[in-house]
Amino acid sequence: GYKTKYMANEIKSVEYGLEKIFEGAQDFLPLLGTDYVEFIVGNAKQAAHYYKTAFGFQSVAYAGLETGLRDRASYVLKQDKIRFVFTTPLTADSPLNDHIVKHGDGVKVVALWVEDARKSFEETTKRGAKVYMEPTVETDEFGEVVRAGIYTYGETVHMFVERKNYNGTFLPGYKEWKSDYNPAPTGLKYVDHMVGNVGWNEMNTWVKWYEDVMGFVNFLSFDDKQITTEYSALMSKVMSNGNGRIKFPINEPAEGKKKSQIEEYLDFYGGAGVQHIAIATDDIITTVSDLKSRGVEFLSQPPQAYYDAVPARLGAHKDCLLYTSDAA
């Protein structure tokens, strides 16, 4: 089989504690982790079925006409620490329709788990964040959840979620979704990072926004000489909160022989937005094999020269561990 090399260091550890690992971060929120990611899609039920079937997510909760929600339907899935919500508008005048018309299916909400949603909202808005939703208390028989939201790049939203006084399956207004169809999980553990694509010369603006508004730190940067192909190039800076649980790389286009992949995204998506969600696994070989067997398609395998060049790219980094594994 071909040789695959892996890198492991303190930044890529599988489990983060709440202690601060990035000294430059202000950590005035602080953030406990990713609470959920909400996609606005044309057919939420179909999307949920796909993520269950192909990726091994489990049914958690539902809100829609049957629960008294008249304008949209939402299906909540979970695998280990990952929660995805798929939402479809049900009325012609829903503003969610505008999101679908402009962007197609895409991420609207990156929700962040916090100890105090009101404090998180106040700390970020006083530093310049644009308000999406004022702090709101939502209650049912299982307790209460406090949520508040701010805008980030494009039409993307960060929702602060405080659930320390709640014991329900997801949020008030949702009912437990019991399904007879429960494919086995595929080893997906948690959201490792989420990448935002922004326009030409906007990367540093949003890097500063995450530093000033969210208290993040830029701990890794790539220029167009490091991330480039024969035809396409990009620039990227990686932002993190203090404990390393939330990492947001910010990409912008760079000049190349052809249009940058980031510019292509901006053209097709209709502006800035979440480009991809990276998910951690303890065993990538087993997980990818399982996903392939369920019909998930991956990029073609890089040539051997890619793997041969890994040691030279890494150099003598003392925090890196290289080892070789055969993969069929």
Question: What is each stretch, according to the model?
Answer:
Residues 34-38, 57, 84-86, 107-110, ...:
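Short, structured motif recognition centered on aromatic/hydrophobic residues
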Residues 45-60, 118-132, 202-204, 208, ...:
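Extended intrinsically disordered, low-complexity coil regions enriched in Ser, Thr, Gly, Ala
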Residues 62-73, 90-109, 118, 127, ...:
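A cross-kingdom feature marking solvent-exposed beta-strand/loop segments within repeated
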